[in-house]
Amino acid sequence: MTQRVRTRFAPSPTGFIHLGNIRSALYPWAFARRMKGDFILRIEDTDVERSSQEAVDVILESMAWLEMDIDEGPFYQMQRMDRYREVVAQMVESGLAYRCYMSTEELDALREAQRERGEKPRYNGFWRPEPGKVLPEPPAGVDPVIRFKNPIGGSVVWDDAVKGRIEISNDELDDLVIARPDGTPTYNFCVVVDDLDMKITHVIRGDDHVNNTPRQINIIRALGGTPPVYAHLPTVLNEQGEKMSKRHGAMAVTGYRDEGYLPEAVLNYLARLGWAHGDAEIFSREQFVEWFDLEHLGKSPAQYNPEKLAWLNNHYIKVGDNQRLATLTQPFIEALGGKVEGADLAGVVALVKDRANTLKEVAQAALLFYRGEPQADAALKAEHLTPEIQPALAALANQLAALPEWKREAISATFKAVLAEFGLKMPKLAMPVRLLVAGQLQTPGIDAVLELFGRDTVLRRLAAAA
């Protein structure tokens, strides 16, 4: 019987979560969904001083925005301390781990001497019990660390789904501290216990964890478990080619939402930031899940390209449902001081969205419909609202008032009739109408703009020219 796939995302809540971080959630989420398995969220909050509930909330908010649903969790490592201590005690009792009384000063001196000899700094196994070895009496008043008895000789070998076969000699690994003098377990140990208890089958994470993997595999095997499949993802680089980080200017995932990016655009972009399905650039969430596999994960670092993300966001705005976009755009309009009333916002969005890369830009383009009475520049009025144009404006207003239906086509036909009657070119009439109705010279098509403003508003504002 095939084992059910179980993946996990295990962030540390020590800062905001950026695109590079959330990609490490997207791929295990997609793999679990593709394989009809389970996706678990685990919060690795053992760094008590740096961890915060605010950071946890941002992680949950970011995942919810991208619709990365979880099947189990969130589990918090700080709430599992009793379990970790239980396993540490079992390992000491069974001889898999031991108490080490070497002080920090002694360890520092040992490492310095090793460096001077050109050796790799490492613990020398002084307190490691072996058959026939006589250990000194533990020093009084010293709380020991607990070290894992790493295998001597041989190698740790695993077939990484991204990096291929990796082999590390056990001689390169010293006996890892799994519990500190105060009894608190260490990171690598907690990860192993969690992965075993949660029956994780695939660990898809950043390649900054590669060096932890041989240590974790040895502990897993010592505890009688089977190591999961590992897939270590190459780093995500920023525009300057540096590792993406807050220090180097990375923006929080929620920042993209607040700037007016759509979740489907960000998800589509993230999916391609280290994985490919042929030449497919644009695909839905459902297609991504259907296509996702570990075999096509990239082996080289992926570089963030804001222009590509903006292009994708523009695509999703252009093809997006106008009513949904209107709902998402309204807060941006209100943030600009607009009051959404009168013109149908879904219709306005449909009119202005094609050139917008973000919902903020949609809102800026839509604002002319929602900022109250137009305040056109006096110089522009003097230039365009000349005595010569007044008869044509009056005729236009009269004919618009008589329209049986306030539709774009009828408005356009009315303009053409007035232009023909007075022998005018479109700009000569459209410019003053734009100033009077919208308060600016640049707008989308005048017939569409007037239709959205509505008959009453248009006629009232045109009357101001009289």
From Swiss-Prot:
Signal peptide: none annotated. GO terms for molecular function: ATP binding; glutamate-tRNA ligase activity; tRNA binding; zinc ion binding. Keywords: Aminoacyl-tRNA synthetase, ATP-binding, Cytoplasm, Ligase, Nucleotide-binding, Protein biosynthesis. Gene3D superfamilies: 1.10.10.350, HUPs. It is found in: Cytoplasm. Pfam families: Anticodon_2 (PF19269), tRNA-synt_1c (PF00749). A motif ('HIGH' region) lies at residues 11-21. SUPFAM superfamilies: An anticodon-binding domain of class I aminoacyl-tRNA synthetases, Nucleotidylyl transferase. A motif ('KMSKS' region) lies at residues 243-247. One of its GO terms (cellular component) is cytosol. This is Glutamate--tRNA ligase. Belongs to the class-I aminoacyl-tRNA synthetase family. Glutamate--tRNA ligase type 1 subfamily. ATP binds at residue 246. PROSITE patterns: AA_TRNA_LIGASE_I. Catalyzes the attachment of glutamate to tRNA(Glu) in a two-step reaction: glutamate is first activated by ATP to form Glu-AMP and then transferred to the acceptor end of tRNA(Glu). Its EC number is 6.1.1.17. It comes from Cupriavidus necator (strain ATCC 17699 / DSM 428 / KCTC 22496 / NCIMB 10442 / H16 / Stanier 337). HAMAP family: Glu_tRNA_synth_type1 (MF_00022). Monomer.
